[in-house]
Curated annotation (Swiss-Prot):
InterPro entries in the cross-refs: Jagunal (IPR009787)
Alphabetical GO biological process terms: defense response to fungus; endoplasmic reticulum organization; granulocyte colony-stimulating factor signaling pathway; neutrophil differentiation; neutrophil mediated immunity; neutrophil migration; protein transport; vesicle-mediated transport
Main location (coarse class): endoplasmic reticulum
UniProt key word Magnesium: no
Transmembrane stretches, start-end: 40-60, 72-92, 100-120, 138-158
Gene Ontology cellular-component annotations: endoplasmic reticulum; endoplasmic reticulum membrane
Residues on Lumenal side: 61-71, 121-137
UniProt gene name: jagn1b
Top-level taxonomic group: Eukaryota
Designated name of the protein: Protein jagunal homolog 1-B
Protein family membership: Belongs to the jagunal family.
Protein location: Endoplasmic reticulum membrane
Membrane topology type: Multi-pass membrane protein
Length: 183
């Protein structure tokens, strides 16, 4: 294809792509991981909002305890799990390593810890439900223990992936800083 001024100059026919600069892989990985972490943070915020709504509705007696059961003990400590998500959101825009590390550590403490405790706290009630078919706590007509175990399963996956992707992102950021120190 020729230009208005005549034939193209040699070397501009598109075959010179091998000499062009490319985006370093750790930058590409950083963008992809940030996107995944943002999605997981939003998923966690939704789960957190649902747990917070149940605790708030129950504590303020907005509806009968027959409609929304009183919260389990682990749900109160799980409300602290918004802290790692806030630090994660603060870490992503400027690649702040300190905030990301705080998010990962507090994620284990405030997210995974209450979930493990909740699984153990609700186990006898779940065992009674599945052995004898008796449930004493309900959330909108459904067994509270079944709903809360579903919340636990979703939360474990969300927080596990958050910590995993945060670790991968941290590795990508450290690769970036190591490359800068070498120059």
């Amino acid at each position: 294809m020729a230009s208005r001024a005549g034939p193209r100059a040699t070397g501009t026919d598109g075959s010179d792509y091998q000499h062009r600069e490319r985006v370093a892989s750790h930058y590409q990985m950083s963008v992809a991981l940030k996107s995944e972490i943002k999605k997981l943070n939003i998923a966690h915020a939704v789960v957190w909002f649902l747990v917070a709504a149940q605790v708030l509705v129950s504590q303020l007696n907005l509806v009968s305890h027959k409609v929304v059961a009183s919260p389990y003990q682990w749900e109160y400590t799980y409300l602290l799990s918004i802290i790692p998500t806030v630090f994660s959101f603060m870490a992503l825009p400027k690649n702040n390593i300190s905030y990301l590390v705080i998010s990962m550590i507090s994620g284990g403490l405030f997210c995974i810890g209450p979930i493990l405790y909740g699984g153990m706290e609700m186990f006898p009630v779940a065992q009674q439900l599945y052995r004898h078919g008796k449930a004493y706590r309900f959330i909108f007509g459904f067994s509270a223990v079944s709903i809360m175990y579903l919340v636990l399963i979703i939360s474990v996956q969300v927080h596990g992936w958050q910590i995993y992707y945060s670790k991968k992102l941290l590795d990508a950021w450290f690769t970036n800083t190591q490359d800068k120190k070498k120059k």
